[in-house]
Regions:
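Flexible "cap/lid" loop of the alpha/beta hydrolase fold
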Residues: 14-19, 23-57
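Short alpha-helical segment within the catalytic ATP-binding CA
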Residues: 7, 11-12, 158
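Conserved alpha/beta-hydrolase catalytic His-Asp/Glu region
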Residues: 39, 54-108
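Catalytic active-site module of serine/aspartate enzymes centered on a nucleophile-bearing elbow/loop
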Residues: 147-176
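Core-facing hydrophobic residues within beta-strands of well-ordered domains
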Residues: 24, 36, 144-147, 155
């Protein structure tokens, strides 16, 4: 399989690829390196937890709740792509927000400490982001020796939302 993960999802796919290399053909990691990071998305997690799905009736209602915590509309739109309608006709998150909140600090605060993935790997970095720094390439090379690094112009950490054209082009070129 080909795997793609952004940020925390990037850490997850790196860990999976190292743990189960026989299951991964190509790996794409968006705007995160295999290093430890200080936790700094607590505001977003708090916003996601603040949505009361017994009270909201529409995606717009959810966006209004998130807007109380998150000033960037494109981030809100990106996050609400993770909504779905349950069988009892209520909105909910596709992910377990309580587990994410509980484990988030442990996961981001730790580097990917073990192993190596020998398959082709694409790291995508937002040109305006500081998540992947030049000194991170040593770790990337050690654990993902067949890596390439592509910078996505005019994009910060939310590169797939800020510049989807260049993001998708880089992904498609890598996969073909």
């Amino acid at each position: 399989a080909n795997l793609l993960g952004h940020s925390l999802g990037g850490k997850a796919v790196m860990t999976f690829a190292i743990s189960y290399p026989e299951k991964v053909e190509k790996l794409i990691v968006a705007d995160i390196a295999p290093k430890a990071y200080p936790p700094h998305h607590q505001g977003i997690i708090k916003a996601l937890q603040s949505v009361n799905f017994d009270e909201v009736k529409s995606r717009q209602d959810v966006e209004n709740v998130l807007a109380q915590y998150i000033p960037e509309k494109f981030v809100i739109h990106f996050l609400t792509k993770n909504l779905y309608w349950t069988e009892d006709k209520k909105l909910n998150w596709r992910f377990n927000i309580n587990t994410l909140a509980e484990k988030y600090n442990d996961f981001v605060a730790n580097a990917i400490k073990f192993g190596k993935f020998e398959g082709e790997t694409l790291f995508l970095a937002g040109a305006k982001s500081n998540y992947i720094l030049p000194q991170d390439e040593l770790l990337m090379r050690q654990q993902f020796p067949k890596y390439q690094l592509v910078s996505i112009a005019d994009a910060g950490h939310w590169l797939q939302a800020e510049n989807p054209k260049d993001f998708n082009q880089a992904v498609n070129e890598f996969l073909t």
